[in-house]
Amino acid sequence: MLVHTIAEVREKIREWKKAGLTVGLVPTMGALHNGHLSLIKKAVEKCDKTVVSVFVNPIQFCPGEDLDKYPRTLDADKELCENAGVDIVFAPSPKEMYGEGHIMSNDFLTYVIPPFFYVNKLCGKSRVGHFDGVCTVVNKLFNIVQPDFAFFGEKDRQQLIILKKMVKDLNIPVQIIPCTIVREESGLALSSRNKYLSEEDKVNALALSKILFNIKACYDKGITDVKALTETAYSFLNEAHALEYLEFRDADDLEEKQVADGNTIVFIALKIGNVRLIDNIALGNI
């Protein structure tokens, strides 16, 4: 069932809640791939009813980013969702989500602003305001759908940590379910932005996973010094790569690590041409 308005979603949610059914939410920006489908599968298995939102959220894009070019494939997304057992595909317009405010100026919108300590690093360092937009839209989706469970991929691990913090601090009655990164056989993490990559770019993009897997292998052999682990990365980089960051952070609060341990996440971001890609790996069983 494809719906475009908040009122339609709320009507169905009222019916489901009255019947005592559990509701799962999978927030997406569309251009669905097997990574999204793994989240959807978990939601359908765990919940009585599943809602997938398809919304390219304008307020989480920074100036000069790919808002206008971001792939929009609603018909294909709807078919994938229906085949996966999704009950509602919620595909609102920006006006439906934000009224006239977003057209006039972001100064007219009420935002959910996550703690600066969580957003002034990694992706938030170069994408100023990005996580304000993410937290605002996810909070709105939680208010609209009122899910019991919400499913997010671990590929956007910083986002996942920030959203968990938001849910805890604002006492939002939803349980966030983290979902494992889905990779191509080559090791490349699935992403909607992979559609921008040429075949040559895809080969160069393998540097992300190769660096992370190599760091994990070195850690498993007993190397814990972050500087030493970082130095192992450079042999995988060439002139096609513009490394934005390679950082070791705590899995709970994103504090920077000097010595790696089982609660460490290794984060990487790099550009290949104009395409920015991110990935991460946990060094322990988290």
Regions found by a protein language model. Give the residues of each.
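Short, basic/aromatic-enriched C-terminal tail that caps enzymatic domains
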Residues: 255-257, 265-286
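Structural motif
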Residues: 49, 263-265
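A structural signal for short secondary-structure junctions
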Residues: 239, 260-263
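Nucleotidyltransferase catalytic core that binds NTPs
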Residues: 1-240, 249, 253, 274, ...
